[in-house]
Amino acid sequence: MHGGGPPSGDSACPLRTIKRVQFGVLSPDELKRMSVTEGGIKYPETTEGGRPKLGGLMDPRQGVIERTGRCQTCAGNMTECPGHFGHIELAKPVFHVGFLVKTMKVLRCVCFFCSKLLVDSNNPKIKDILAKSKGQPKKRLTHVYDLCKGKNICEGGEEMDNKFGVEQPEGDEDLTKEKGHGGCGRYQPRIRRSGLELYAEWKHVNEDSQEKKILLSPERVHEIFKRISDEECFVLGMEPRYARPEWMIVTVLPVPPLSVRPAVVMQGSARNQDDLTHKLADIVKINNQLRRNEQNGAAAHVIAEDVKLLQFHVATMVDNELPGLPRAMQKSGRPLKSLKQRLKGKEGRVRGNLMGKRVDFSARTVITPDPNLSIDQVGVPRSIAANMTFAEIVTPFNIDRLQELVRRGNSQYPGAKYIIRDNGDRIDLRFHPKPSDLHLQTGYKVERHMCDGDIVIFNRQPTLHKMSMMGHRVRILPWSTFRLNLSVTTPYNADFDGDEMNLHLPQSLETRAEIQELAMVPRMIVTPQSNRPVMGIVQDTLTAVRKFTKRDVFLERGEVMNLLMFLSTWDGKVPQPAILKPRPLWTGKQIFSLIIPGHINCIRTHSTHPDDEDSGPYKHISPGDTKVVVENGELIMGILCKKSLGTSAGSLVHISYLEMGHDITRLFYSNIQTVINNWLLIEGHTIGIGDSIADSKTYQDIQNTIKKAKQDVIEVIEKAHNNELEPTPGNTLRQTFENQVNRILNDARDKTGSSAQKSLSEYNNFKSMVVSGAKGSKINISQVIAVVGQQNVEGKRIPFGFKHRTLPHFIKDDYGPESRGFVENSYLAGLTPTEFFFHAMGGREGLIDTAVKTAETGYIQRRLIKSMESVMVKYDATVRNSINQVVQLRYGEDGLAGESVEFQNLATLKPSNKAFEKKFRFDYTNERALRRTLQEDLVKDVLSNAHIQNELEREFERMREDREVLRVIFPTGDSKVVLPCNLLRMIWNAQKIFHINPRLPSDLHPIKVVEGVKELSKKLVIVNGDDPLSRQAQENATLLFNIHLRSTLCSRRMAEEFRLSGEAFDWLLGEIESKFNQAIAHPGEMVGALAAQSLGEPATQMTLNTFHYAGVSAKNVTLGVPRLKELINISKKPKTPSLTVFLLGQSARDAERAKDILCRLEHTTLRKVTANTAIYYDPNPQSTVVAEDQEWVNVYYEMPDFDVARISPWLLRVELDRKHMTDRKLTMEQIAEKINAGFGDDLNCIFNDDNAEKLVLRIRIMNSDENKMQEEEEVVDKMDDDVFLRCIESNMLTDMTLQGIEQISKVYMHLPQTDNKKKIIITEDGEFKALQEWILETDGVSLMRVLSEKDVDPVRTTSNDIVEIFTVLGIEAVRKALERELYHVISFDGSYVNYRHLALLCDTMTCRGHLMAITRHGVNRQDTGPLMKCSFEETVDVLMEAAAHGESDPMKGVSENIMLGQLAPAGTGCFDLLLDAEKCKYGMEIPTNIPGLGAAGPTGMFFGSAPSPMGGISPAMTPWNQGATPAYGAWSPSVGSGMTPGAAGFSPSAASDASGFSPGYSPAWSPTPGSPGSPGPSSPYIPSPGGAMSPSYSPTSPAYEPRSPGGYTPQSPSYSPTSPSYSPTSPSYSPTSPNYSPTSPSYSPTSPSYSPTSPSYSPTSPSYSPTSPSYSPTSPSYSPTSPSYSPTSPSYSPTSPSYSPTSPSYSPTSPSYSPTSPSYSPTSPSYSPTSPSYSPTSPSYSPTSPNYSPTSPNYTPTSPSYSPTSPSYSPTSPNYTPTSPNYSPTSPSYSPTSPSYSPTSPSYSPSSPRYTPQSPTYTPSSPSYSPSSPSYSPTSPKYTPTSPSYSPSSPEYTPTSPKYSPTSPKYSPTSPKYSPTSPTYSPTTPKYSPTSPTYSPTSPVYTPTSPKYSPTSPTYSPTSPKYSPTSPTYSPTSPKGSTYSPTSPGYSPTSPTYSLTSPAISPDDSDEEN
């Protein structure tokens, strides 16, 4: 669809991409215009007399009815006709239920009578709204609505303005104002809705109808809306062009086409109509009835009923789930499916059919393991392979293979299913009688069966992350399941217990290329989610690897040979055996070392490694062989296990991937598996019941432990019964008891488990699996052998089910271990029935949990993805969403991709000042130490040179500053960070590669180190730009890495620790730079989806419910999925809101002070400190009823300070709890004060002393005096005293705050045990120290109040309530808090997610300046397009809004494009490729007129001597011959610049404009990347370093077949000798033409006219002379300035900077030649310019080549025409066998210079004397001309270069020899454009005359008798002014027209003016080069 070509055969019409989608409401006129049923649909019936009825609901004009029929409107058949809308004219308008709410809003904004806006549009507020809501019509309506809500009168002009205080000038302005608004001044009704009806009510009686409330008919609303002006529509957020308010009321109802409501034909004749058709029938019926009644003048109530019914039917057609309305049913009682239900929900139209569809070319079956496949292969059953097809385009190269497949048809396996002819006909081979009769032609497509090597996508649902869909290569295997390598199960999360997987076969070559380059399994080994590998070695291989690398594994010679057989990368050398006598034995480690690729270095530990071995004097000795050291690719010591080969960061696999690349790592995986599994076959591994039996002593031990544990539990129970158990702080007695019991039982289980494990021997097979990490854990072993342990439900012991017991077998209230679910048996011993039951309870809980969790996390993941789906890295490296809002300025804040970073330690952060100085300061005073580390001359330099010493001091200063910065960034002293380029490992690599001896002094100058690091850090650019902001951003992005770089590569460590040589150091810097650049995130990467998956995937692994920390007396916090849900929903009320309060100063260390603060925070009510309350009738206070209070009460009443008479006889006595009072530091006085403050004088409150035995408050009501008098009268109303007192009591207990903050219900105080909560300080001597300080943690939050408390640290105190942090501290704080909370949730169960994903989520949620929840309320309130929103949630509402407001969707996001089936702007879709049209002229046409190049059978040209695995070439690889030929057809004579002699391209006049005759410069030929064959540096297919040089080897090169091992199998189409466009018989090609390229066969070196002694005619012809850069034999490294390049030739000024061969920008015009491309590195040995074949003295180098023009831009050395092959190579020369070393050093495939090999000259035979250019018989017109024998006829099939036996001169040159493919399309020496020196080279154009200065026409070699060559021939006459070399235009070097006649000194080719640097001559000045 992209780009406009015809899509896949369905419709021939070209499609353009949709740029935006406009929504709107259709107006009645538009509906009628669009409708195909004139006059509307009148009849509810569908058929009449068995025929569809015109004007009925199956009107034949609306679409096709029968399968066989045609549409009456468009005459299309079922597949073609899209259906056409009809319409129904409603008798009366009705409301559209989707717009009902909008209708009401608009009604409330305009005047009910005059339709004016209720707010004057000149009102400044309106202007403000309009300015603020550009492009957001919905927002505009909301704001205007808010303004209008308060208006209840439609004002006239003046009052309106005065009200707003607008100054009123007198006179005319007044009138204009009044006109301006001119309201009618009437009161506005309130609009109410009931069901589907609207009512208007007035506060005052309405003037018109004298009623307060009237029914608002749709007509009336329609009238009001009609009168609204367009301007006011706009203010109301409508877009008058697309959606006017009155259109929201249905007057004409569109009838959907038949294809939308197809009728189902049942058996028999009856049709089952669709729900919509039923609904429409109802509407038509009632509409007709209404119209009849109206015409007949029926009673008003009848009509009203009809309208109501019509309204109901229209509404339920749109939405049948309306609240408050009955459902519209079918007869059967099933609710009808309305339009809304069709769209919404998972199965609806949007999510079910547009966003996701079922696809073709997919297969699904069960998976089974196969360790012998490579990780990127998948075994496909033959039955599937024979059913799935791939459409391959027929080209001359694959025609034979495809013809064979077609012959086999569909019945045999490698066959084909269909042929698609170029006219679109599809031939089905399944039903074709004789497929062998079908002939193919190029351009047809053959749908062939899937075969080995095809690329497919393999997927397992649920697709949680991008590693759930990966590219694999097919391997056809027998039987019916997919087979895959064991290691790939981890990313797919697959196992083989019956899982099924899906396979998709991509149908185009682009898709294939993308999968191969981006999604193949090996490229996915390292996940960006947590920067570690996702695949490791698993199962039996892992078990075996651990056994195999133990110390005592020895292998015999036979075994070793056998294993080496399985090592695919084995080089044929058997290593020296470790043991020689008595017989040679090899160790397992030796064999494993052969598997390890490259020079890998790695240190890990084995799983059983004891920690105490890491430090101490013996840290280098590992007695248990548990330290793994791999050095330089050799396993030196250590047993490998899951730690080294698993999916952990820094494992061997990870390092291999980072250092060696994905392909080598793929082999590593395969080799480990094949070799080790085959060893395991010899060795064996089994497990039986015997492995699970321990010895009797162990069993005794276990019994005793359990007995003791039970005893302990009983003791605890007794303690609890006797009330001796002290509750731990913050817990109740029950909790304390449970915690203790749990602890005892868990300890018992652990203890028995460990004793069981100790008893197992080293050879136990259980143990060997656990130790290697393959399966199982220690718990599993202990459960099998010792004890199963306690069963839990919801984190507690099994609860009592009924009657206080768990099961009826136990007594009531039994808290003992057995009754509450402790299983004391092991699995081996078997469980008792009760134990079994409890065990099942625990297990069942796990199942339920899993099921619930899956749904929860699935939804979370979907929301995450939808909220971030379009967030991507753009080409300016910022991270933006689809509406181009910046989310992050640099991805992950450092601009790096997640896959390429690793954990590293910052060396300077931790050590104390002393250690820091010792390690990092270069001590130039200590001479002895210097001599040990540096070489003598360096020592002298350092000691004597003050400048150096200053530099070194400065370096140390810089590191000290870095350390300060680090300590601010990481205040906790945690030095583990994630950075690119593992420096320590790179240094280690350097030491190995350069064989550094760490004991010898180094020759690396300290200053060089300092300078080198400085230079390097300048090169590591993340943010380009030189303005202050960019510079700051660059510093922020690279700060950590630079610090790390400076501290690792500091001069001291270089000299002392690493001892690198200068050379090694340079290599290291280069390596760091390139690795760093590779780590930068790619633009186009969809980081949003990546982040969403990286968070969603670990969430799936989390447990759903919160297990509380058993036994810890801390608050419970929500964790896991519920907490994640709270965070991303931004819930206002989290389940467990909590503050962490840090304290200041003394309080932090002093428990008492901390307790004071705790009391100040914790909310205390009276209830919390009350022991009991009672109400007494106690009329006489002096002798109180409560005897114990008598004493102190008397004290009060002896001297009352109040009126004793007023006291009520009722007494409220409150007894307080002494313990709680002291806990909360409360005194009686405080409480009494609070009571008095609350109730004042109405209560009398007395209390006893704080030290009294019981603390008592006595409270009485005080009656006021007046009440005393009037008591009798008012008895009725007054509450009794005792009742009143009771109310006061409850009020006091609950509502009265004694102290603290209301929201904070409880505060816990604790000393942190973990370091992350301790206070970290830095001591004087610079060490980190963690101090324990008291921390308060609260239940409930009130951040604002707590922060303002005294002694609270306002900086560190924080809340876990996100919303609260936002309100208190703002958006930046909440972003950090959110990030921290998310990190906490994820890391709680030990997962790790790279920071950049969390950061991206937090930034997405906060980048708008407010918190955006990841729910429909957040995501769908953004400014994204309606299509994206409707694909998330609220589908119909979103679309209705969009329509009503006339919104448009700019189609920038992912969902939008997927819905419309377009390429989304993501990844490879977010850029376009620029086609260089100029270059297209040089495209080669593929000769399509030969029956088949491969006619000679498999050895023919197709398979070459290196048959490719696919058998030839994948057809679709040659896009050229689909209509593109002319575009690339510079070769076809019909095209202007072709070779036709008269064609403009070659006429001297045309060229002269362009080039001033400089032969090398012509518009027709400039080989830049656009030329179809040029390989681009990124060319994915570079099979060999050499190959890259050949331009024809680019992926697009038609002939290129990616899998052909030899590179150029000679099938390149462009070379068929019979191709009309350059068949030598073509007239313009006459070889006798003088300028016919000398390498053309007709100048055979043996032909007399070609004497190599002629100075200017070196055997390879001057036109290929080395000075012609386009033919430089050294190709890329050839540069005219390259000093080794004939330095004596003046034209190569060695000083010209612009050509330095090492300059990376070396290829000014073509990326494909960039010297950095692997295959052309100038240092590559094959390019050495001194290689014999390029010695500057070789005649072929003569700088005097006539046509060489150094200034010609297309001769830049990048011109593809420089074949790297040796110029002087002549195949007939004996020493040039193709094996000769300098034969084409970089490109095996061809040497254009070999005259004998120009395949395009079919009849050429280098030794044939008759072939001289003058040979009369070689007339261009003789097509079948054969110089020596009929078999040479160029069209003769035998002669095709594909004929294997054809060899022009010697057997070595068979064209099938892959080394020599004649077919490289670009280098045809005979191609006119390939005369490298003259692009426009048409043999007949005069331009190329021999008069070029060095081409001396009198040179004897040129047989002057040659008729065409006559030097006097006018066209070439050397004197002809047009072509005279002296003519200014011709001077090859003279751009400016200065005359260089060849006789003039200036033109001597050796004269200095000819030098490239001479300013007068370089049009392509150095700036162009760089």
Swiss-Prot record:
Residues 1593-1960 are annotated as: C-terminal domain (CTD). Pfam families: RNA_pol_Rpb1_1, RNA_pol_Rpb1_2, RNA_pol_Rpb1_3, RNA_pol_Rpb1_4, RNA_pol_Rpb1_5, RNA_pol_Rpb1_6, RNA_pol_Rpb1_7, RNA_pol_Rpb1_R. Residues 832-873 are annotated as: Bridging helix. The modification Phosphotyrosine is found at Y1860, Y1867, Y1874, Y1881, Y1909, Y1916, Y1923, Y1930. Residues 1569-1583 have a biased composition (Pro residues). DNA template strand binds at K346, R358, R1416. Residues 1083-1124 are annotated as: Trigger loop. CDD domains: RNAP_II_Rpb1_C, RNAP_II_RPB1_N. Residues 1546-1970 are annotated as: Disordered. The modification Phosphoserine is found at residues 27, 217, 1843, 1845, 1847, 1849-1850, 1857, 1861, 1864, 1868, 1875, 1878, 1882, 1896, 1899, 1906, 1913, 1917, 1920, 1927, 1931, 1934. The modification N-acetylmethionine is found at M1. There is a cross-link at K1268 (Glycyl lysine isopeptide (Lys-Gly) (interchain with G-Cter in ubiquitin)). Zn(2+) 2 binds at C111, C114, C154, C184. The modification N6,N6-dimethyllysine is found at K1838, K1859, K1866, K1873, K1887, K1908, K1922, K1936. Sequence repeats lie at residues 1593-1599, 1615-1621, 1622-1628, 1629-1635, 1636-1642, 1643-1649, 1650-1656, 1657-1663, 1664-1670, 1671-1677, 1678-1684, 1685-1691, 1692-1698, 1699-1705, 1706-1712, 1713-1719, 1720-1726, 1727-1733, 1734-1740, 1741-1747, 1748-1754, 1755-1761, 1762-1768, 1769-1775, 1776-1782, 1783-1789, 1790-1796, 1797-1803, 1804-1810, 1811-1817, 1818-1824, 1825-1831, 1832-1838, 1839-1845, 1846-1852, 1853-1859, 1860-1866, 1867-1873, 1874-1880, 1881-1887, 1888-1894, 1895-1901, 1902-1908, 1909-1915, 1916-1922, 1923-1929, 1930-1936, 1940-1946, 1947-1953, 1954-1960. Keywords: Acetylation, Chromosome, Cytoplasm, DNA-binding, DNA-directed RNA polymerase, Hydrolase, Isopeptide bond, Magnesium, Metal-binding, Methylation, Nucleotidyltransferase, Nucleus, Phosphoprotein, Repeat, Transcription, Transferase, Ubl conjugation, Zinc. The tandem heptapeptide repeats in the C-terminal domain (CTD) can be highly phosphorylated. The phosphorylation activates Pol II. Phosphorylation occurs mainly at residues 'Ser-2' and 'Ser-5' of the heptapeptide repeat and is mediated, at least, by CDK7 and CDK9. POLR2A associated with DNA is specifically phosphorylated at 'Ser-5' of the CTD by CDK7, promoting transcription initiation by triggering dissociation from DNA. Phosphorylated at 'Ser-2', Ser-5' and 'Ser-7' of the CTD by CDK9 (P-TEFb complex), promoting transcription elongation. Its EC number is 2.7.7.6, 3.1.13.-, 2.7.7.48. InterPro entries: DNA-dir_RpoC_beta_prime (IPR045867), RNA_pol_asu (IPR000722), RNA_pol_II_repeat_euk (IPR000684), RNA_pol_N (IPR006592), RNA_pol_Rpb1_1 (IPR007080), RNA_pol_Rpb1_3 (IPR007066), RNA_pol_Rpb1_3_sf (IPR042102), RNA_pol_Rpb1_4 (IPR007083). SMART domains: RPOLA_N. It is found in: Nucleus; Cytoplasm; Chromosome. Catalytic core component of RNA polymerase II (Pol II), a DNA-dependent RNA polymerase which synthesizes mRNA precursors and many functional non-coding RNAs using the four ribonucleoside triphosphates as substrates. Pol II-mediated transcription cycle proceeds through transcription initiation, transcription elongation and transcription termination stages. This is DNA-directed RNA polymerase II subunit RPB1. It comes from Cricetulus griseus (Chinese hamster). The lineage of its organism: Eukaryota, Metazoa, Chordata, Craniata, Vertebrata. The gene is POLR2A.
